[in-house]
Amino acid sequence: MALLALSCAGVALGWGLPALMGALASTSLLTLALSRQSAPATRDDGPQPTSLEQVSPSQAEPILAEVTSEAQAAEDDEIQVAEEVVTSATTQDLAEAVSAAEEVTPDGLALTPAEELATDVAEEPPASHLDYLALAERITNAGDPVPELKHFVGDIRTREAESEHHPSGAPSELERYAARMLEEAGLFEADPKLPSLTAVQLKSSHLIYLRCKEHNLPYLAKLRILKLESAINAIRFASISLSEDATQEEAYQLNQGLARSIVAQARPIDEPLDSPDDDNWPEGEWSVRYGISQTIETIQLPYRLSARYRTNVADGNVAIEIQLTPAEVFPSSCYVDGLGIVPTTGDMRQRASADYALRLALLLAASAFRCSERIRHVWVAAVLDTPSRRNCYYCVDFDRWRFSRIDLTDLGDLTETYRSFAPLMRYEDGWLRPVRQSFHLEEERFCPSRRYVPVSLSSRRLDGHVAQSLGTNHVSGLAIEESDSRALVASAIMLRLAPEDDAKSTQKNVRAVMELAGDDPDPTVREAAERVVRGLVDGSLHADALTIGEEFVRGDELTRAIDSAKALIMQQKPGKARQAIAPLLARMDEAGVYADTPSVVYRFFSSYVERALYNRLHADEEQRATVMLVPDAYYEAHLLVSVTYLMEGQGEQALAHAERMVELAPLDARARLHIVKCLEVLDRDDEAIEQLRELLERAYEPQGAGYGYYRMAFFQWKQGNVNAAQACYKSAMHLIPSILAVMSMEMSVLYLQNPDMVQDDMEPEAIEGILRANDIPIAPTEHTCELFYDCARASLDAEIFPVARNFAHIMGSFMGDDIIAGVIRSLEDEPDH
């Protein structure tokens, strides 16, 4: 008899979102208490099903248990399965759970006196048992998991064949189940040939995914990979949920029940979602997208979940598109009451696929509704992409009022559940048939075009927590492109140009330019219009649309001079390069064109993140002064002039232009690194180190911080601080692995020169301690992280998508978090106008 063992399992679920795993058997219930935060729940068995396709939640009530853990545990520990009392459960709760488990036999009936006597003399479990944790470790550490899986199955079958002569080495029933699942998944099949794979264990759900680097993967190979993957996870569920002496039949029942119990993981839609934030921010785009992504990454599912989604919280809409799990991925055998383990037919797999897809939609819709009370509608579509076609199998609009009336713990007849939502669906004889997809993710109702209005041209105001977090009360206060207004007018002009073969094209084009730009309030637009008109009239400007557009936006004298200077620098002619731009730059600076005043400051920003962080760090200053943007050409001109001076060894002159760059762009890592180079040439190492400290104190992205540590390592080494240099090298390697080879060579020299001073194994804690001891900031600093997170969330809640995408991508590169990656994927691209 296989009795349930109460056990604790730590599974990382991000910032505390609970995930429920249903463990159901067709003829017995084997429960697993996996929660640190709540007592195990128990339910009674329902009527016995007669076949796989006849199983329903009303016939077999699943027993569910929460799977929770701290996020840190996910990074360090494997799932620990141990027979111990759940510390957070009350004595009464545990007593009830144990009592319920002890009253159930594998047949779901109360023990008779004879059976009680039989249990007293039950056989010892076999010496061999299924060690899933060891298997997971082997395949995730292997270069290719397939040979390891073959060795695993081969060992089981060998011991099975020798069991008559060596009974002590006979594989357990769960081992036989594991071998059968992998064999039926095509592990030993030669065709289709599998590419080289890697097995990864997801941090949030601990499920195993098989990944390959090939993009053009044959469809049949894809199906085989997905089936192998699902077989591995079926082994996982059986291993962590069942006792060592469980039978193959019980393992089949468990996984069949799990596939039909996935909706039981959903919590009531009005139950507040665990939030990573401790503040009182209103629910918005950030919390909804994060919540949906967290659900996708943490729920326990028997098959890989591939889903895309879009949200429009302001209008109460969420759209989700699921990739249907193909019927070919479902198991090739199943347990049927009265028949035992039998092969599945194509019809049975199609029915199972349809049933699973319908339940998955309910689970995801429930999770989306729970993210915010503002969500009123969740659209879900299931599609399947094959080599020849893309089919949609259902489209349904779940509204919050009707959905709240569904009993997610007892769905009953799925067709009745769906009927109230009037879905676009053909559900015939348990099969889903293709239908026309009635909505698409990129529609205006899910992706409003207002989100991509050019930031510098927006007239929208901001208030409340959004304005405070972004350091501005209007969207245009996040602008970074000085040329936006010219680019917008240039686009309009290009659409109005006359055909080149028109005899009066010049006259018509001049009129179009003057009508659209002649009276523009922006002086740079009027100047560009005059420049283009002169070129059209004297014939120096070709009248095709692209040429005119380029001239309008980038045709100023300084930009043209910079293009020439770059070519001369590449030819190692720094003097001539400087002569091309220095006079123009000097004339601007002497005239004070971009000089700061008490009411206006001129700045350059390389990214929206940089602008938002600048707003926050300089909020007090900007209350008194307006920030104006300098042209990219002006900033670049100072850089090129400084470079030409460095090429000629004139450090002081180079430093003057580098200081102007830092004044214009105080958060730009390039400016800081360049001024460090100038100070190095002048042997002013202490000042260079201070500049690097300033860079690291404000670094917000991996590349800037990484190069900051790389340069700091050089100066620490130069001053004899070997351990500090080593710590900086280690930090840089972590942040910018692209230059790992260069840094490794330099570290080798450092080790050879200082064999008695370097530390062989410098752990992260030791690195932090050394950096702090040498007054070197640990980038990104806690203050920078707080500002960054506030700005990221505010920009998404305010639906300023050019800014939000910038923040999200940098956050993803720093964190490497699957949930954040999901948020990034949910941000739609700019619509094509």
Predicted feature locations:
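TPR/TPR-like (Sel1-like) alpha-helical repeat modules
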Residues: 585-586, 694-697, 722-741, 747-755, ...
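Alpha-helical linker/edge segments of TPR/alpha-solenoid repeat scaffolds
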Residues: 522, 533-544, 551, 605-625, ...
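Boundary/linker segments of alpha-helical solenoid repeat arrays
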Residues: 101, 105-108, 112, 130-136, ...
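Long, charge-dense low-complexity segments
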Residues: 12-22, 26, 30-70, 75-499, ...
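"A position-specific structural signal for the A-helix of alpha-solenoid helical repeats
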Residues: 527-532, 544, 556-559, 563, ...
